[in-house]
Amino acid sequence: MPVKLRIFLSHGEASCAKEPETFLGSNRVRPMSISNSIKITPELVASHGLKPDEYQRILDLIGREPSFTELGIFSAMWNEHCSYKSSKKWLKTLPTTGPRVIQGPGENAGVVDIDDGDCVVFKMESHNHPSYIEPYQGAATGVGGILRDVFTMGARPIAAMNALRFGAPDHPKTRHLVAGVVAGVGGYGNSFGVPTVGGEVEFDPRYNGNILVNAFAAGLAKSNAIFLSEAKGVGLPVVYLGAKTGRDGVGGATMASAEFDESIEEKRPTVQVGDPFTEKCLLEACLELMKTGAVIAIQDMGAAGLTCSAVEMGAKGDLGIELDLNAVPVREERMTAYEMMLSESQERMLMVLEPSKEEVAKAIFVKWGLDFAIVGKTTDDLRFRVLHNGEEVANLPIKELGDEAPEYDRPWTPAKVPAALSETDIPEADIADALVSLVGSANNSSRRWVYEQYDTLIQGNSLQLPGGDAGVVRVEGHDKKALAFSSDVTPRYVEADAFEGGKQAVAECWRNITATGALPLAATDNLNFGNPEKPEIMSQLVHAIKGIGEACRVLEFPIVSGNVSLYNETNGQAILPTPTIGGVGLLKDWGRMARIRFAAADEVVLLVGAPAGLGTHIAQSVYMRDVHGRTDGPAPHVDLIAEKKNGDFVRGLITEGLTTAVHDCSSGGLALAVAEMAISSGIGATIDAVEGHNPILTFYGEDQARYVLTVKKSDLDKVRAAAKAAGVSCPLIGTTGGSTVKLGTARAVEIKELHLAYESWFPQFMDGETLIAAE
């Protein structure tokens, strides 16, 4: 039974008189000492994303009915987006440490040592729900948020990537969403001044009602100058930095923790609005401030805004926080405490300040045209107090709000792995026709239309641009050192077998970084799944995390940051499970960096990691999906020992200067890998068939742990000797040269034909000239 309130208007928030005592369920609720203007009903509680048992937990915790503002605070802090309550148990199983890890999960971003007193700071996170509702602003503020995560740690951003998933190309909303998201990513990143060096774009009907926008950013910092969010010291000023607070984004974190339904348009006001030029000023002001010794702790205001940043800083430091909302800079009149606490206005920071540096800090932010306001203080009582118009509108236990939020062990079903395909169940197709079809398909064609809208060269350090295996950026101040970045996942594999799919996402990211010659250092995960309250969805999440963990351990590729996005469903239809992995690698000498394009004619082509017949696994391949419309059978097995051995071997060859081109072998198998190498270089290749082996398996099988290499004929004996010593399969499979790609006995396909198909699909789709389904 809801508490009965009699509401009287006052100059501040409405005050309320209540019965001396009331009952809610079986619990006696003490009279509230905090004024309230809104009646707390079961419907209101449900609209805040809180389950009845969670609301009962709140009542038990605080011993009274929460105020409306407190209800909003609990809703924000206890939702999936902020608390990770459904995934925390399993995230704890991931490997997060290593010899180069300076800071693992739990901070704004991960930090990894790259020698010479330098470190790379990076993270990937989602902005899925906002980008579907308002694609331009949703994507733009996703980029802004991840950039703030990086420079909050004291790092200057040097690279960005984005992994985008859209619905079927023939869905009426897809073209609009692609245009808006790509424009938003480019509009923010380009204006801010960070190069976009890689990413993914894929289409599938399962994303029709719930697209994915996963944004990655990396920055450089000094290893001895990393800034954390843990508040320290009692009675110290809590300072608001950056842009003013408005009503945009109120309830955004709660919206991001719920499924979509017919009311989706009503959620448009929960999408934030970004300003990249203000963010650029905020970056410069923060980095300047950090050099003064004024910063004790700092946290960006992202999901749940002022609420989450204040609670996290206090809870991590075992301190209380007191805020006075009348000191918060606002850009709209008559904002309520609820709105100010839950606003997700962009380009804002919260800091615990060294008191003696107040005037120095203020002068820096005034110089950059940004707000600087002391809005509170740290306390020693572990309480989160919020004052507004002279009244206390919230008084809650800060640890229970923050790092002691609810944690669930949700039920999950055993994994179900599809049966293997029989040899007689492999459909035939003309090898050459299939190749032309695949390079010109929705999911395998060039993404040039997308990445040419991004500034890939700003800052002047980009060495490899989108279109290769990984983006590569030179480390400024060093003649030879560079960093490689890649983002990968194959959702159809995860759908078929979440454990193997999780392993494969890590392995392909590691492989792409290795293919440049870089040593993979560490990774960030962005786990996108449906409703975890459904055991079959929770099973996908659990098994994917198990697979990710196993791969990271074997490949020595720890997870140092990440994000979980659940409830990616519309009207009960879940997305494909999509655990995106972003990785970073170190090139000690970028002069030895490998590229995917063939370097010259009359060189030999080798396939590292080749199984018998060069390829064997056709189930869940793009050949089956895009040529024959089938998505059955198991995902390919990922032999992690082979991945490590083969990758280390390839990296060694690159470092020794024995390769002239390198490309990982993944979706589309050997055929697509060779075609992409030929298209990017304009040099053809002839690849031999394997006598007695099905050519479909040879050319389109998606066996893992493979690389296509080219080497000069004069170096072939050295490479073969090295392969034998390493115990690595590395057969010679063909030669480069000519103007065609010839696979076995199939007709030779002109590179011009492949290039036209490869480059045409995306611009034709966006111009409305083609509606090829991604099925």
Swiss-Prot record:
**Chief location:** cytoplasm
Give the domain of life.
Bacteria
GO cellular component terms given for this protein: cytoplasm
Active-site residues, as the UniProt record annotates them: 81, 127 (proton acceptor)
E.C. number: 6.3.5.3
**Catalysed reaction equations from the record:** N(2)-formyl-N(1)-(5-phospho-beta-D-ribosyl)glycinamide + L-glutamine + ATP + H2O = 2-formamido-N(1)-(5-O-phospho-beta-D-ribosyl)acetamidine + L-glutamate + ADP + phosphate + H(+)
Listed Gene3D superfamilies: PurM-like C-terminal domain, PurM-like, N-terminal domain
| Annotated positions binding ATP | 84, 123, 525, 562
Where, by residue number, does Mg(2+) 1 bind? 125, 563
Keywords, A to Z?
Answer: ATP-binding, Cytoplasm, Ligase, Magnesium, Metal-binding, Nucleotide-binding, Purine biosynthesis
InterPro entries registered for this protein in UniProt: PRibForGlyAmidine_synth_PurL, PurL_linker, PurM-like_C_dom, PurM-like_C_sf, PurM-like_N, PurM-like_N_sf
Entry keyword annotation includes Oxidoreductase? no
Q: Which residues bind Mg(2+) 2?
A: 149, 300
As one GO molecular function, the record gives: magnesium ion binding
Query: Where does this protein reside within or beyond the cell?
Result: Cytoplasm
Please list the GO biological process terms of this entry: 'de novo' IMP biosynthetic process
- Describe which pathway this protein belongs to, using the record's wording: Purine metabolism; IMP biosynthesis via de novo pathway; 5-amino-1-(5-phospho-D-ribosyl)imidazole from N(2)-formyl-N(1)-(5-phospho-D-ribosyl)glycinamide: step 1/2
**Binding-site positions, substrate:** 126-129, 148, 272, 344-346, 565
What EC class is this? ligase
Instruction: Give the quaternary structure.
Output: Monomer. Part of the FGAM synthase complex composed of 1 PurL, 1 PurQ and 2 PurS subunits.
Q: What does this protein do?
A: Part of the phosphoribosylformylglycinamidine synthase complex involved in the purines biosynthetic pathway. Catalyzes the ATP-dependent conversion of formylglycinamide ribonucleotide (FGAR) and glutamine to yield formylglycinamidine ribonucleotide (FGAM) and glutamate. The FGAM synthase complex is composed of three subunits. PurQ produces an ammonia molecule by converting glutamine to glutamate. PurL transfers the ammonia molecule to FGAR to form FGAM in an ATP-dependent manner.
Family assignment from sequence similarity: Belongs to the FGAMS family.
The protein's name is: Phosphoribosylformylglycinamidine synthase subunit PurL
**Species of provenance:** Agrobacterium fabrum (strain C58 / ATCC 33970) (Agrobacterium tumefaciens (strain C58))
- Gene encoding it? purL
